[in-house]
Swiss-Prot record:
Stored Pfam families: 2OG-FeII_Oxy, DIOX_N
Organism: Coptis japonica
Name by which UniProt lists this protein: S-norcoclaurine synthase 1
Catalytic reactions on record: (4-hydroxyphenyl)acetaldehyde + dopamine = (S)-norcoclaurine + H2O
UniProt KW Transmembrane helix keyword: no
One Gene Ontology term from the biological process aspect of the record: alkaloid metabolic process
Domain of life of the source: Eukaryota
UniProt KW Hydrolase keyword: yes
Length: 352
């Protein structure tokens, strides 16, 4: 199998959401309408239930590290989601990535479509995880890239407009990989492991930019991203504009996330749940659409290297036994690329 996501599986072709939105529809097409949203239990946004905030500078400061490590461990155990502040990623790198992302999605459809996904592939501009003609669809378009390792990049999908996009993505992905390696090293420490046990395998980086198109209130209820847990190891997300919409599932209720300016929203993925033998759990989340304006976000997914086996780490199975299967990453990638976003359905396949 090719290592650049060609041949691992891809979505069935569906019409581009930007094209559909340009038709000024009076109603959302039926495949995008989610009647179940009317019955969902959503925590009011002014409620005190908020995800933890972790300060990376304190984790790295000997004076505060002990307390912050305990707080970090609690966030991973009880939430699987947290906001990361004082992360060390240069503000100018983040802001330039935001600007270039906005500029890319503002391009005419014809220009963006030059970077469209190929059949049976994940990379590029389009949609993902469409596996049947009947499933409900997300009211969003995405642009998906492999950024690390460098030799696995397929530059066919890397835009040349805006002209700075490639250089910006290079700098951004490099800095975020450093942060992810630091966090996974701290996770390993909290689990009683050597830091490289988690940092060494998670060196593949995928970047996905999402544009959730606005929907007029008369169009009915839809979702920009279906409820799911990330199939990857660790995700770092930054919101590009001021439009909120990320919800996480906590105690069977949907909790809206209020991003802190300049912070990354970080979440544990299925791979770390498997490797930790369920000590740290991935969390179901979704994105809702706004009635007035599009929502833009950039997610950096940190995944195992090709040739890696995914399974519970031996030092973490002694007390409670093995809870998950061990499989080759390539096989896992094929599974994750050919399943619709549906809660934790992929992880359920991995349980013993």
């Amino acid at each position: 199998m090719s290592k650049n996501l060609t041949g691992v599986g891809g979505s069935l072709p569906v019409e581009n959401v930007q094209v559909l939105a340009g038709k000024e529809l009076k109603n959302l097409p039926n495949r995008y309408v989610r009647p179940e949203l009317e019955h969902d239990d959503v925590v009011p946004i002014d409620n005190s239930l908020e995800i933890p905030v972790i300060d990376l500078s304190r984790l790295l400061d000997q004076q505060y590290a002990c307390d912050e490590l305990a707080k970090f461990h609690s966030a991973c155990l009880d939430w699987g989601f947290f906001q990361l502040i004082n992360h060390g990623v240069r503000e100018e790198v983040i802001e330039k990535m935001k600007v270039d992302t906005e500029d890319f999605f503002r391009l005419p459809f014809k220009e963006k479509n030059a970077y469209r996904q190929l059949p049976n592939g994940m990379e590029g501009y389009g949609q993902a995880f469409v596996t049947s003609e009947e499933q409900k669809l997300d009211w969003a378009d995405m642009h998906f890239l492999i950024t690390k390792p460098v030799q696995e990049r397929n530059m066919r999908f890397w835009p040349t407009s805006p002209t700075s996009f490639r250089e910006t993505m290079e700098k951004y992905s490099m800095e975020l990989q450093k942060v992810a390696m630091c966090l996974t090293g701290m996770m390993a420490k909290n689990l009683g492991l050597e830091s490289e046990i988690l940092t060494k395998p998670l060196r593949t980086v995928f970047n996905r930019e999402d544009e959730l198109l606005p929907s007029m209130s008369s169009c009915g209820e839809g979702l920009g991203l279906s409820p799911h847990s990330d199939a990857t190891g660790l995700t770092l997300l930054i919101q590009v504009n001021e439009v909120n919409g990320l919800h996480i599932k906590k105690d069977e209720k949907w909790v809206p996330i209020k991003p802190i300016l300049g912070a990354f929203v970080v979440n544990i993925g299925d791979v770390i749940e498997i490797m930790s033998n369920g000590i740290y759990k991935s969390i179901e989340h979704r994105a809702v659409i706004n009635t007035d304006k599009e929502r833009l976000s950039i997610a950096a997914f940190h995944d195992p290297e090709y040739g890696t086996k995914i399974g519970p780490l031996p030092d973490l199975v002694k007390e409670n036994g093995v809870k998950y299967k061990t499989i080759d990453y390539e096989d896992y990638l094929i599974r994750s690329s050919n399943i619709k976003l549906d809660g934790k359905s992929l992880l359920d396949q991995m349980k013993l």
